[in-house]
Amino acid sequence: MSPNSSEKQSSADVPVAASPQPGPVSQWLNQQGFDHDALEPDHLGVEQIGVEALFLQVITAALKSNGFDYLQCQGGYDEGPGERLVCFYHFVAMAELIDGKRDNLREVRLKVFLSREGEPSLPSIYGLFRGADWQERETFDMFGIHFEGHPHPKRLLMPEDWTGWPLRKDYVQPDFYEMQDAY
């Protein structure tokens, strides 16, 4: 049976993935003129925003001035072999909740998508949030993401002479590593 023109589906009938609706923080950033990408909220409904590494410090400072005064978590993950590395920052407006100005917690997660080629890097936010110190060091140690301007840019968990980044999906574990005994 040959298809006739009435049976063919037009390209207008094919569903197109809609862009996520910008959340309140994304809308505020738009009003302030900050370039970013609204991402889908996570499974708990937390707003997620994609930013370029170049704008990370400026957008982080803007969020801090807008009440996001606590860096709850910073970390990284690998999207898979040959894919991007992701560095994320989870901010919370803690003072508003403690002061009783709000009944619900405002939170937002920034994500910076990086190429795994070469030495992926982005600016440190240690100057804005001191709590980023060990979190950025752990992300460097496990994924090899360099944080420019970090005051203590060295490994946190692995020995200083360790080769590679253990939480990357393409990491190959060495057959043997001899550690010096402290005793």
Swiss-Prot record:
GO BP annotations, alphabetical order: photosynthesis, light reaction
User: Where is this chain compositionally biased, Polar residues type?
Assistant: 1-12
Lineage here is: Bacteria, Bacillati, Cyanobacteriota, Cyanophyceae, Synechococcales
Q: Which family does it belong to?
A: Belongs to the complex I 30 kDa subunit family.
Q: Which GO terms describe its cellular component?
A: plasma membrane-derived thylakoid membrane
Location comes to:
Cellular thylakoid membrane
Quote the protein name from its UniProt record. Answer: NAD(P)H-quinone oxidoreductase subunit J
NCBIfam families hit by this protein = PRK12494.1 (NF009141)
At the top of the EC hierarchy, this enzyme's class is translocase
